[in-house]
Amino acid sequence: LVLPLRLVLKGDTHGITKSMALLQWILMLSVFGISHLAYLLSLPELPGFSSGGRGLLLFLVFLTEINDIMQFIWGKLLGRHKILPKVSPNKTWEGFLGGVISTTVIGYFLGFLTPLSAPNVILVSALLAIAGFSGDVVISAIKRDKGIKDMGNSIPGHGGVFDRIDSLSYTAPVFFHLVYYIAY
C-alpha cells in the first residue's frame, strides 16, 4: 500500500499500474508462496502422526527439489520433445513426465512423513511435481521478460539458489492446502 502511494506523491504515475502489478506478483511468488513453509510448522498435532510439521516440511522441500533434479536428469537423458521452447528451451516432455513419475514414486516411499493415506500420498506427490514444474516455468518466463539469464551459478547447469527455490513458490501453497484439506 505504501509503495504505490510513494509513486503518486512523487508525481511519477506513468506506468503505475504495471509497476503495481509487478510488485504484487513479486510479493505473491516470494512472500505468499514461500510463507506456506512456516504454516506447515504451525499445523496442530494429529493423533498417530508423530512427524508433525517438521515431517511435512521435509517431505515438501525434499520432493520439490528431487522433482527439479529428476526433471533435469530425465530431460538430459531422454529429452527430445520441447515442452515450452519460447519460455524454457531446455524443458522437455520426457523430463517433465520422468520427473512426475520419479517424484510420485519417491513420495510414496516418504509418505510416513505425512498423515496421508497411500493413495493420497501418491496424488499429492504427483500434484507437487506438476506444481513444481509450473513454478519453475513461470519464474523462467518472468526472468526472460526481465532479461535475466540465470540467478547465479552455484550449481553448474542448474542455476543459483533462487533457481533452486522457484518451484517452492508454487509447491508450498499447493501442498499446505492439500494436506490441510485432506488430513485436517
PLM regions and their residue ranges:
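Membrane-embedded alpha-helical bundles of polytopic integral membrane proteins
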Residues: 1-127
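Hydrophobic transmembrane alpha-helices of multi-pass small-molecule transporters
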Residues: 103-104, 164, 171, 180
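A general structural signal for short secondary-structure boundary/capping elements
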Residues: 107-108, 174-176
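Short, conserved aromatic-histidine micro-motifs
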Residues: 120-121, 165, 184
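Juxtamembrane boundary at the C-terminal end of a transmembrane helix
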Residues: 177-184
